[in-house]
Amino acid sequence: MRTHYCTDVTEKLIGQTVTVAGWVNSRRDHGGIIFIDLRDKSGLVQLVADPQDCKDALAIAETVRDEFVLIATGKVRARGEGLENPNLITGKIEIILENLVIENRSRPMPFDINDEKVNDEIKLRNRFLELRSKKSFDIFQLRSKATIQARNTLDELGFLDVETPILTKSTPEGARDYLVPSRVHAGEFYALPQSPQLFKQLLMVAGFDKYFQIAKCFRDEDLRADRQPEFTQIDVEMSFCNQEDVIKVAEKLIYDIFTKCGKNVPSTFRRMKYSEAMEKYGSDKPDLRFDMPLVDVIDIFANSTNEIFAEIAKDKKNNRIKALKCKNGDNIFSKRQMKSFEDYVRKFGAKGLGYFQMKEDGLKGPLTKFFSEADLEEIIKVTELEVGDVVFFGAGAKKVVWDYMGRFRLFLANEMNIVPKDAYEFLWVIDFPMFEVEDGRTKALHHPFTMPNVEKYDLDNIEDLEEIESIAYDIVLNGTELGGGSIRIHKEEIQSKVFKLMGISQEEAKEKFGFLLDALSYGAPSHGGFALGLDRMIMLLAGTDSIRDVIAFPKTQKAQCLLTQAPSAVDEEQLKELSIRIRKTVVDS
């Protein structure tokens, strides 16, 4: 039927007869001669319906409209002088129609597929039409290339591709599970996996040594621009390894994928301890495409006559006072703008935001009256201020200060337009805390199967659980967490201790994780691994701001598929088979 894709038709084929197929991108009638731009996945080619060559083809071309599906046969000829289109691969030739078939017609389009300003809801309701755009096809071609390279690299390194179950057991991994009711076991539920974590560990216990999977994962969590309820990750696990071994594999994999996709990236990445990332950048996923570190000034502010600062500075363990220098900020932002920045940080828990302006005769601003000349000079010194700079200050509980000052750092950089768009800055964040305590509850920062640094910490004799470090690592790219992993617990007694420290009783541990504890008692090897978020990786490679652009049929931020109207109600008979009854809540008006 088809002999060539549209962009395969070049000057080399002049004089030959070809058959192409695709969609009408545009149609133009020039005084009895009709020009059609035909589009397929490769691009565009111009068709010409001329009555001197084929009246039948012209008659059909007169009825053609945008997005009709055509099969066209004709002879390739060079375009006339001055008629070439340098913006097209096929811009030097055209196809003179000898036969034209309308394979299918199209209703008028609800939107222009190349108009990026179209309402998201309209595009998602007609996602199959949006996917016709060149931008969409290029993204999925990139995704396919990256996925194939991932498989090839891991295969070359001796990893075995193994599929793990989709219907599994509900276990606490942080987010809520998607539950699937069982018809056979009334009142019981499967859970869709948040990750293949436990199964890949069991494969290491089984002796598979090296495993990988392009895995579908599901999490019922609040959505944002870089999250979806179902997502894909490149999942990797290996036996008899340490952190260095795992990082080498991950760097090789990332390097190969990015190189295959035409990006120039280093083969090894810099590293930073979690504590340094939080103190210097207020984030465990810092964007290092620009500098602007946070500077600790709590000792200087301890001397302040401002009672609030002085009180905060008394507790250096739990509080922070951070300075953020804005280069040439005094010439970029007005006083009104600088005052408005306080509204921004208040959204993230800040109680205020102070600032100094560096003038020719020293620091100026409403806070200077609370400091001695010596302390003001010290602020200039530690923040390396020059005339025209502005320095902002955040003070309070350390986690709150880290969060809002880290966000403010990114906000300022974008306001100043100093973030290079075409740079790729990778970073390993290492030595994460094993636990975090919130509202009196102890949670694993990564997951409870991560190996704590037992060589450095005695789990039986520790007062502050948040001091315990784990052998965990995240890979960050341009301020986005691309993935992460850890060395796993491979001894049953350590896993039981971790559960106990988290407040999980022996009975609960046995009920939820008995299969894992059993497996660890049968000679489990040391093992570790990582997972890379494929969707996020493609989002960064493609330079798009939304993860929805890189998923063929994505959900909205309300976890709905507008195309298929999922989730949807099911009939009573189906519910009855599943022993489920929907309880309707009546709200009094």
From Swiss-Prot:
GO terms for biological process: aspartyl-tRNA aminoacylation. It is found in: Cytoplasm. GO terms for cellular component: cytoplasm. One of its GO terms (molecular function) is aspartate-tRNA(Asn) ligase activity. The keyword Nucleotide-binding applies. It comes from the Bacteria. Keywords: Aminoacyl-tRNA synthetase, ATP-binding, Cytoplasm, Ligase, Nucleotide-binding, Protein biosynthesis. It is an enzyme of class 6 (ligase). Residues 197-200 are annotated as: Aspartate. Belongs to the class-II aminoacyl-tRNA synthetase family. Type 1 subfamily. NCBIfam families: aspS_bact, PRK00476.1. Homodimer. This is Aspartate--tRNA(Asp/Asn) ligase.
